[in-house]
Amino acid sequence: MSRSLYNWLYRDTLSSRGRTALLFGGVVILVAAVVGGTWYYFHAKAVEKEEQARRAALVLQQKRTSIHNFYTTALKGADVRGFLALYTEILRSRQPIELAGFREDSFSCTTESCSFSYLAGQNTVFSVQDKYFRNVSYAPSFSQESVDYTGIPSGMSSNPVLEAFNRQEKISEPTCNDILNYVYSYNSLVEAGQRFTLTTLPASSVSADEEALPGNPDNHGLLAGKWQVSLPDNYVTVHAFWHNRPYSSSFIFQSVAGKQGILDISGTLLCKK
């Protein structure tokens, strides 16, 4: 009887202790889960915030890069002085080859390089000779009837506006209304063969980016269009056309090509909004 009572009491005690242990263990697990969940929540929030900041910084950097690339592309080229210096060298360098009996068929220059093609005359004794351009000699490639020179540096990749941009200095250009009024007025007064053609009106692909980054040093609020003009291939006409041209700093020269006595000149037109 006493042993049965003892066993019953002992069993009850063990059951109570077990329940206490289970309850304690459950509390510990619950607390751990709450703490772990809380840590995970705030850690996840911190990671998400860092990712948002990283993405925002990346977007801003992409905007800065877009602005920089827009201006370096639009501003790359020569100013009037640089273009006239290049054209003078083109005229000078063609003379020795023409004296040897070759006729310049065509040439073209970009902001990077120039190429020239010469045809042999009917009574020309075919001989290969180098082309001297800015006191540097360039060997040709040739066929039975022509002599070609390629890869000659044009020296037409820089100008004062681009240099000011690279120094992060202020760039002052006329308003688009002023320069467009000038171009249209000029075109109305001259023959069709000497008119400016605006192949692309001034615009900007980065205006919104500049507004989003008001303190960006590359911001200048400029618009860029494309112009083209055709002129006779002779120094007097070309020099007279560009000498003392109003708004000359707004004309960036990026290409010149000559064929059959005509020059096609083109580039970027700069102006303020």
Give the positions of each predicted feature.
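N-terminal positive-inside, membrane-proximal cytosolic segments immediately preceding the first
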Residues: 1-32, 37
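Generic signature of intrinsically disordered, low-complexity segments enriched in small/polar residues
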Residues: 9, 43-44, 73, 121
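Periplasmic/lumenal scaffold domains of single-pass inner-membrane subunits
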Residues: 44, 58-60, 64-65, 85-273
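Short extracytoplasmic/periplasmic juxtamembrane "stem" segments immediately C-terminal to an N-terminal membrane anchor
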Residues: 49-69
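N-terminal cleavable signal peptides for secretion/export
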Residues: 70-89
